[in-house]
């Protein structure tokens, strides 16, 4: 007989898990809608040409693709491209700014990891048509309120502005393509710093940590050897990765971020970046902390028209953010985000209890993206939650109530009362309660045992009580039983 198994990198959700997810989903929807965002839905697959419009053919390696009717399609890896398609096609007969939200599955073709699946869910918002710093602040606020409403406390919010790096590189004469490449390197440096800090905080290094460091050491060895062979740099000193490095993994956990910095610095200089510019980029990437400390430090360090404008924008966004009541944040100038379409404000929400996959949300301003998809120049800002990680984060927080599955189970002393059970259950459903009746012929003890697993209350029907127009209401948490008039049952349930 053929054995069937779950596709790699996917998940089944049993009733209790699905109840948790639906509960969080409703919180997400209500929070988004409270800020005026309206839900949209797009196909789970798009023409591959659309999905590759910005990233090029190389995106194919990380996607599920197929051909139908002579057209190549791809399962969507994210939702923003579809939103841009909707805008560019001119079918939106509504005033700006557009305020959309979406919740749905996305797909990536890569090796599955812990908390990183091939099918995953995103919940996000897009605010299109406003260049105001207040729009950035509102988008960030929606993220903060969503996590708080979902019971995810203890998150870390990092806010920066990628325009600072773009301004430094622009003043040095580098075009957008070179900027994107170097900013991508900075993003890699930042993520390595975070990862190695997590590893250092552990009492014992895990197998996946060793694998991570080995992978980076092998990559650094190849990069450094190429630079040395080309005569770009003769040595990297204590940060030079030798073949013996793989035998000294624990020692490299602390040195790896600096080694990566030195290697990228050498590459940048080889590509024409002035030494002082390379050093400035790395110095800026290390600046982070409270607004009162970071902004004066940044304004003293950074000069240049483009850079100063980005700092002013960041300061204004933070002012609006505090007006929204969001004060628990860090200003981190090194937040670069891995995607090259960001143009200004960038931000991330981390939940440390998730470990290596701690980021639950990320986003920022992308004023040129709609234009790059063929539309008119349109300012925009937005973000996406990793919905699965939000649910997981919520479950890691203590004292979070589990959403109930059923409000009430109708139990009967014997089968002669089944019709009455149906009548009562229907009346309760019409009043908005989730009600279930006995379907398997169990005795009363069996029914109550089942009810305790799936419901908050049990309503027990007995011939004697029904003659008096009453039923027995049992609180399945406290075990307390109370006689209640049938006509007052819904009031007693609260």
Say what each PLM segment does:
Residues 17-35, 46-49, 80-92, 100-153, ...:
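Positively charged, Gly/Ser-enriched RNA/tRNA-binding surfaces
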Residues 157, 161-165:
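Glycine-rich, mobile lid/loop segments that gate access to catalytic sites or pores
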């Amino acid at each position: 007989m053929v054995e069937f198994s779950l596709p790699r990198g996917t998940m089944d959700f049993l009733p209790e898990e699905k109840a948790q997810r639906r509960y969080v989903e409703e919180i997400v929807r209500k929070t988004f809608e409270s800020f005026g965002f309206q839900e949209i839905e797009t196909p789970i697959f798009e023409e591959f040409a659309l999905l590759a419009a910005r990233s090029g053919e190389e995106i194919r390696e990380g996607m599920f693709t197929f051909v139908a009717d002579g057209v190549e399609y791809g399962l969507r890896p994210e939702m923003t491209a579809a939103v841009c398609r909707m805008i560019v096609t001119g079918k939106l007969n509504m005033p700006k700014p557009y305020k959309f939200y979406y919740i749905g599955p996305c797909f990536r073709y890569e090796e599955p990891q812990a908390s990183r699946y091939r099918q995953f869910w995103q919940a996000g918002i897009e605010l299109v048509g406003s260049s105001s710093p207040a729009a950035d602040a509102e988008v960030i606020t929606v993220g903060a309120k969503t996590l708080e409403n979902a019971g995810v406390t203890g998150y870390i919010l990092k806010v920066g502005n990628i325009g600072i790096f773009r301004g430094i590189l622009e003043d040095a004469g580098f075009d957008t393509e070179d900027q994107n490449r170097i900013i991508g390197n900075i993003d890699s440096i930042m993520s390595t710093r975070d990862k190695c800090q997590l590893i250092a905080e552990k009492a014992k290094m895990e197998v996946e940590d060793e694998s991570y460091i080995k992978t980076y050491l092998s990559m650094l060895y190849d990069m450094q050897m190429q630079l040395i062979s080309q005569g770009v740099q003769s040595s990297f000193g204590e940060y030079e990765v030798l073949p013996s490095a793989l035998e000294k993994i624990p020692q490299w956990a602390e040195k790896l971020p600096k080694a990566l910095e030195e290697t990228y610095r050498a590459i940048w200089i080889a590509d024409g970046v002035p030494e002082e510019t390379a050093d400035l980029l790395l110095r800026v990437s290390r600046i982070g902390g409270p607004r009162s400390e970071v902004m004066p430090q940044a304004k003293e360090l950074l000069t240049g028209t483009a850079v100063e404008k980005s700092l002013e924008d960041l300061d204004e966004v933070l002012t609006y953010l505090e007006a929204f009541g969001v004060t628990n944040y860090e200003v981190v100038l090194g937040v670069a985000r891995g995607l090259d379409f960001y143009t200004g404000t960038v931000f991330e929400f981390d939940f440390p209890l998730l470990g290596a996959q701690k980021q639950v949300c990320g986003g920022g301003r992308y004023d040129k993206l709609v234009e790059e998809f063929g539309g008119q120049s349109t300012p925009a800002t937005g973000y996406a939650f990793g919905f699965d990680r939000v649910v997981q984060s919520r479950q890691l927080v203590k004292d979070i109530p589990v959403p109930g599955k059923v409000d009430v189970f109708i139990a009967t002393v014997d089968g002669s009362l089944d019709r009455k059970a149906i009548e009562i259950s229907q009346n309760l459903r019409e009043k908005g309660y989730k009600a279930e009746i006995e379907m398997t012929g169990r005795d009363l003890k069996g029914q109550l045992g089942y009810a305790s697993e799936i419901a908050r209350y049990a309503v027990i029907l007995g011939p004697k009580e029904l003659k008096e127009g009453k039923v027995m209401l049992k609180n399945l948490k406290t075990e307390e039983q109370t006689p209640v008039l049938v006509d007052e049952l819904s009031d007693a349930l609260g």
